[in-house]
């Protein structure tokens, strides 16, 4: 398991604001020796970002997210079903509020197009995911950990709407709707 979430948590506690933690091949300027649970966030309070951090065998760039007046500005968000409809507009609103947004959708091409429309790298990141499949969701979580080290907000918007009465659906159609 990656140290990225713990590194992100240390900087969040130290600086009082979210950061993005991404793998780096650059030379580290800060090295954590020993368990991260023993690192005092107070030792990082004066750290100027961006910084390259070595934690165990991993090296990360820790960079600031945008800051502003809104409470969610600078947060890292995930919107499932984010390629179209309500999800796309929620993603747009989060970007407009200053969030870095993962646009997650079963339609990978749609997610990529929406992420590019919202500003692309540094603002939005597409992820192809089937939220009804555990392995797909696990792969999404690994991608999020790799790219930013974690999340602050989750909008679980993905869903399936079927025409007709729920009373007339067969069991597999009903199960798929409720699994999502």
Specify the residue positions occupied by each region the protein language model found:
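Glycine-rich flexible loops
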Residues: 1-77
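Canonical Rossmann dinucleotide-binding motif of NAD(H)/NADP(H)-dependent dehydrogenases/reductases
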Residues: 70-102
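Conserved catalytic-site loops of classical short-chain dehydrogenases/reductases
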Residues: 76, 152-153, 175
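Rossmann-fold scaffold of SDR-type NAD(P)-dependent oxidoreductases
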Residues: 80, 151-158
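Conserved glycine-rich Rossmann-like NAD(P)H-binding loop of the short-chain dehydrogenase/reductase
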Residues: 99-113
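Conserved residues in the N-terminal Rossmann fold of short-chain dehydrogenase/reductase
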Residues: 103, 128, 179
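The beta1-alpha1 cofactor-binding region of Rossmann-like NAD(H)/NADP(H)-dependent oxidoreductases
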Residues: 108-109, 128-139, 171
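Substrate-binding pocket helix/loop in short-chain dehydrogenase/reductase
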Residues: 165-166, 170-175
